[in-house]
Amino acid sequence: MNPLISAASVIAAGLAVGLASIGPGVGQGTAAGQAVEGIARQPEAEGKIRGTLLLSLAFMEALTIYGLVVALALSFANPFV
């Protein structure tokens, strides 16, 4: 195995996880903040807002998991070797 390919794969795996978690992290923070603001404005709609928030957080977290899958594929099932 070429050491240059191995090193590039490790760097790419780190970048995949790092960059894949930036967007969803910002989105989750914004969504949670807006949900808290909405519940503060309309306390009677707490259940509906919370349900929608949890569903949207799950979809956002899926993007991070996709980045982790790409990183694991680069680490253990390297297609470039």
Curated annotation (Swiss-Prot):
* Keywords, ordered alphabetically: ATP synthesis, CF(0), Chloroplast, Hydrogen ion transport, Ion transport, Lipid-binding, Membrane, Plastid, Thylakoid, Transmembrane, Transmembrane helix, Transport
Record Pfam families:
ATP-synt_C
What membrane topology does the UniProt entry give? Multi-pass membrane protein
GO MF annotation: an example:
proton-transporting ATP synthase activity, rotational mechanism
**GO terms under cellular component:** chloroplast thylakoid membrane; proton-transporting ATP synthase complex; proton-transporting two-sector ATPase complex, proton-transporting domain
Residues annotated as site: Reversibly protonated during proton transport: 61
Q: Which InterPro entries match?
A: ATP_synth_csu_bac/chlpt, ATP_synth_F0_csu, ATP_synth_F0_csu_DDCD_BS, ATP_synth_F0_csu_sf, ATPase_proteolipid_c-like_dom, F/V-ATP_Csub_sf
Name of the protein: ATP synthase subunit c, chloroplastic
Q: Which gene encodes it?
A: atpH
